[in-house]
UniProtKB/Swiss-Prot annotation:
Function: Binds the 23S rRNA.
Protein name: Large ribosomal subunit protein bL31
Gene label: rpmE
Residue positions binding Zn(2+): C16
Pfam families: Ribosomal_L31
Natural source organism: Escherichia coli (strain K12)
Amino acid sequence: MKKDIHPKYEEITASCSCGNVMKIRSTVGHDLNLDVCSKCHPFFTGKQRDVATGGRVDRFNKRFNIPGSK
């Protein structure tokens, strides 16, 4: 194996905008500032909302009164 070809793998701090701070290991080489993390992302917190945008199929089913449509 060749020596000194791999990037330096070191511990860095990842700080989220919600205030959560995590120590992780990475080859980035500097601390990270995150917008969202598992503590504040709606998918992980259970505060996500369902977006029912409908669409062309729903509009078609409504227009022609297709059985089984919503």
